[in-house]
Regions:
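Extended non-catalytic alpha-helical interaction modules
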Residues: 1-220
Length: 220
């Protein structure tokens, strides 16, 4: 995610030296001002998690983050520092691919990726769902988000979506004014979720950094 910080991104694009690659990379960036469910879906597809899957199925896919990073490692005119950052990003994507494969082998789902923005700091996203319950019912979806917003500070959000479409949310905000803003906007959030036929059952806002606890003990 460090590579997708606005300052690093400008330096990165400036050293590409390839107008076509720069344009393609820019197309992968979302706008925080116009974010929507469709662009989140597109960001997941373009995250690099599914490139090998599409190739194995002989399915056409657009250039994704991982393919572009690999291309830059071979063709790009990058400084040694940026080359190391690009290599680290590829390693992270491949690590998340392995996590997803291991989850699928256990009848679970796990997608971990980063959404880059043109007008905001990147957002780290992790979707998870456990195996089906013993009674055949669906397990809850757990969605974790993390970003360090310039105007709101570090934020962590854990959302649990139940089979009955009820939602529980926990927000950790390091800045006290950001926590206050989140509490004040709870009614707006509830109304927005209703537009997607979702019910906000509980929202907990904590003025603190999210504790680092083993996800296997907490359900992420």
């Amino acid at each position: 995610a460090a590579l997708f910080q606005p300052g690093a991104m400008q330096a990165f694009l400036g050293q590409m030296g390839d107008a076509e690659v720069t344009q393609r990379f820019s197309q992968l960036l979302l706008s925080m001002a116009n974010v929507s469910p469709d662009n989140i879906r597109q960001a997941l597809v373009a995250s690099g998690l599914f490139g090998e899957f599409f190739l194995s199925r002989q399915m056409q896919s657009r250039l994704d983050v991982k393919q572009l990073m690999r291309k830059l490692l071979v063709d790009g005119k990058l400084t040694s520092e940026l080359k190391a950052s690009v290599g680290q990003l590829v390693d992270e994507i491949e690590g998340h691919q392995i996590e997803g494969l291991q989850a699928r082998q256990s009848q679970q789902i796990s997608y971990h990726f980063v959404i880059p923005f043109s007008d905001a700091n990147p957002v780290e996203v992790n979707f998870e769902r456990g195996a089906a319950k013993d009674d055949g019912g669906s397990s809850d979806w757990v969605i974790n988000l993390h970003t360090d917003a310039e105007d709101l500070g570090p934020l962590w959000l854990k959302t649990t979506v139940k089979a009955n479409r009820e939602i529980d949310m926990i927000l950790w905000a390091s800045w006290s004014d950001s926590a206050s803003k989140a509490e004040a906007a709870s009614n707006i959030l509830q109304q927005s979720l209703q537009g997607f036929d979702l019910t906000l059952n509980k929202l907990t806002v904590l003025n603190a950094a999210r504790p680092s606890i083993d996800s296997s003990l907490t359900g992420s």
